[in-house]
């Protein structure tokens, strides 16, 4: 049997709409992500389990893990009879790369089970394609960090889909999911079709400056440049309490605060444990809306998707 864990991820990381993503894992060892296991069988089957299993489609063929199996078999040119099991531990529509977790774990598990017939770039291309079926367009800012780990910049040139950007090991990423759902398609539909020239210039400056600051090891500058002029001004209305949380993050001393993916999860970057604990406590008390919500203090997950056991 093969079992793969795929971690949560932050799409956009504020400053890089659709082109930047970061994998994260809680510092307490909690597995914040999905697992998919594959074992030999006479015919294909898919079993669903996990905390958020009730949120999955009732029709098995609408399950993205079934579609991963189907597309993988198509790619290698033969049908592989297996029993698959999805542990759905990630809330759907959370802004934590939930669908990417299932896609990455499903495709990587199949590839490992079949002795890796597909290379990493081919597999990542399939991951983007499958994730695009859910979000409505192909973008790699969740699947790339989820699969490869770390902070990833999407390049999509010269046969390269993404490459890792050096980040800061002492940064703590406080992740808060309020327990409500925001669909990626809805969050994309709210964005304008065109942007002002000044916003385009600002976006280019922030993104280029952030990447430069990461490579030249300037954490304060990097954090200051983590600003979103593309999505956050429009998506804030979908996120109850976000404006208050951002204000609290500044007062508590977080380096940066933003929307994870299309929300409703937010992240706050802190450079010491005490600040992260204060931020987590505030979010636990003020940002969570029901008992499905949670707060985790995380670090970048540099390993990405990996075999368990």
Swiss-Prot record:
Cellular component GO terms held in the UniProt record: cytoplasm
Q: Which residues bind ATP per the record?
A: 91-101
Q: Name one GO biological process term.
A: threonine biosynthetic process
Q: Which residues cross the membrane?
A: none
Entry EC no(s): 2.7.1.39
Which Pfam family, any one, appears in the UniProt record? GHMP_kinases_C
**NCBIfam families, sorted:** PRK01212.1-4, thrB
Similarity remark: Belongs to the GHMP kinase family. Homoserine kinase subfamily.
Indicate what this protein is called per its UniProt record. Homoserine kinase
Q: Can you name the source organism?
A: Serratia marcescens
